[in-house]
Amino acid sequence: MSKVNKEGAQQTSLLDVLKKKMRQAREEAEAAKDEADEVKRQLEEERKKREDAEAEVAALNRRIVLVEEDLERTEDRLKVATSKLEQATKAADEADRARKSMETRSQQDEERANFLETQVDEAKVIAEDADRKYEEVARKLAMVEADLERAEERAEAGENKIVELEEELRVVGNNLKSLEVSEEKALQREDSYEEQIRTVSSRLKEAETRAEFAERSVQKLQKEVDRLEDELLLEKERVRNLTEEIEQTVQEIQGS
């Protein structure tokens, strides 16, 4: 009985170890799945960042086009203002020379000179404003180009990160497939072990049943032996008594 119990305990321990390994395999598979989900999430985030960076690059490109168009218009206005300034300067010079050479001219000529001076002042203001706008546009263009360069760098970094995450996802996928195959094999082994354990347990129960039956049979036989021994003792006692009676009868016959 102790040997059977020991074998049953060993089989139970083996089953516990197998179940523990199965739980560990499932936990590792779940961890691998969680890791794959995390990598997918990071990949989606990097793709979103790359799309945002590409959208930002496109917006900056549109801004550059608008700024360049504004710069071209400003340059055209600057050219026109410069031309007007040159013309006004020439006219002012001519007017000044005419004023100096013809101080006795009529009030109309003086008004003409004043008008030309006013045009010169206006042309100077226009030219200065055009210069300021040109400098502002050039500064904005430099800032936009710098933003575009940084956005392109971020987009390139995002693409590199996506490549790394895709490679990591591939590795995790392969590990997950390996764990799934291992889990399937372990499940098959577990089913085989459980079937063997059920068979052995059934045989053990049959052996225990036979042992109990044999033990009851031994007890019955022991009782029968005890009964027969008691009957043998009684029979010996009867034989002894009968022998004594025969001897006594023989003695009585011989004495008579």
Swiss-Prot record:
Residues 24-52, 91-114 have a biased composition (Basic and acidic residues). The keyword Coiled coil applies. Residues 23-53, 85-116 are annotated as: Disordered. The molecule is in a coiled coil structure that is formed by 2 polypeptide chains. The sequence exhibits a prominent seven-residues periodicity. This is Tropomyosin. One of its GO terms (molecular function) is actin filament binding. The gene is lev-11. InterPro entries: Tropomyosin. Belongs to the tropomyosin family. SUPFAM superfamilies: Tropomyosin (SSF57997). Keywords: Actin-binding, Coiled coil, Cytoplasm, Muscle protein. PANTHER family: TROPOMYOSIN. The keyword Coiled coil applies. It comes from Caenorhabditis briggsae. Its main location: cytoplasm. Residues 1-256 form a coiled coil. One of its GO terms (cellular component) is actin filament. It is found in: Cytoplasm. Pfam families: Tropomyosin. GO terms for biological process: actin filament organization; muscle contraction. Tropomyosin, in association with the troponin complex, plays a central role in the calcium dependent regulation of muscle contraction. Involved in muscle actin filament organization and muscle arm extension and morphology. Also has a role in male mating behavior by regulating the copulatory spicules. Binds to F-actin.
